[in-house]
Amino acid sequence: MKLELFDFDLPERLIAQVPLEKRDASRLMVLNKQTGEVTHDTFSQITDYFQTGDCLVLNNTRVLPARLFGMKEDTGAKVELLLLKQEEGDKWETLVKPAKRVKKGTVITFGDGRLQAVCTEELEHGGRKVEFQYTGIFYEVLESLGEMPLPPYIKEQLDDRERYQTVYSKEVGSAAAPTAGLHFTNELLDALKEKGVHIAFITLHVGLGTFRPVSADRIEEHEMHAEFYEMNEETAAELNRVRKEGGRIISVGTTSTRTLETIASAHDGEFKASSGWTSIFIYPGYTFKAIDGMITNFHLPKSSLIMLVSALAGREHVLKAYNEAVKEEYRFFSFGDAMLIQ
């Protein structure tokens, strides 16, 4: 398929720069994947679209404040470090700016000196492998010294960094938030439980590759980035039980969807406790094995994310719905409004 088939006109003013004051005050577009019919609502009414016995699957990853600003120990030159992937213990793959200042053996000091990074290997495109040395607990030091790596299309500074975390975030490791989950409040989750909806959790640590544009003219040639995922025994058992009893499985976000489809594809449609790295690329023509519907935000033109959504609801239905969203001035991307596909 040609990349241009997933393009649409998006005015820049519709890219949400800040989150709404109330998480569930965002608008909700409901898209019928069979007919393409669209209805408009608010996210606080999401419970109306669920039935007893359905299961909502959430990604409980937590975003690292992964952007660090430090200086070279020998010269005092300023250096910016972005954590990409934990390799082993205190060893990380990072992105450094300006990369030319950091050679193998360079020591970078952050804050008051309780965190240091030693460059152990030079990679291409500004990549560097480093080993951290610190006093105390690494993630606590990072929380006090690091900044949130907001998506490139968000230009505003975030006043409250918790607004770039879901209310159920738990497992630290993402470079970006699973943004479909940002709309949920604890009260909304409680209301779903009271209605008899099961709530299950998976973990997928979102990498910065999620913002990487698809550049191949034919989308089949695009290579997805790999991301770490995990599903425990409790979630696997819950999902298999829901499926057996005829309930629907609704994933929250493309990250939850990719995790569920990775696991179900590997086990003949069943769910099993597992962990590993997934680079699954879902686009039209894909047969879904895990989910019946999903909640997601409004995505970038020509992105792998709009291709996944198109695989579930049909490209023509999705583009028609997106054009209506533009006309109705929905807010787009990470801090934007939501879509329920069912």
Curated annotation (Swiss-Prot):
The yes or no answer to whether the keyword Cytoplasm is present is: yes
Its Enzyme Commission number(s) read 2.4.99.17
Superkingdom as given in the UniProt entry: Bacteria
| Disulfide-bonded cysteines | none
Q: Do you know which HAMAP family this protein is assigned to?
A: QueA
Question: What PANTHER family does this protein map onto?
Answer: S-ADENOSYLMETHIONINE:TRNA RIBOSYLTRANSFERASE-ISOMERASE
Name of this protein: S-adenosylmethionine:tRNA ribosyltransferase-isomerase
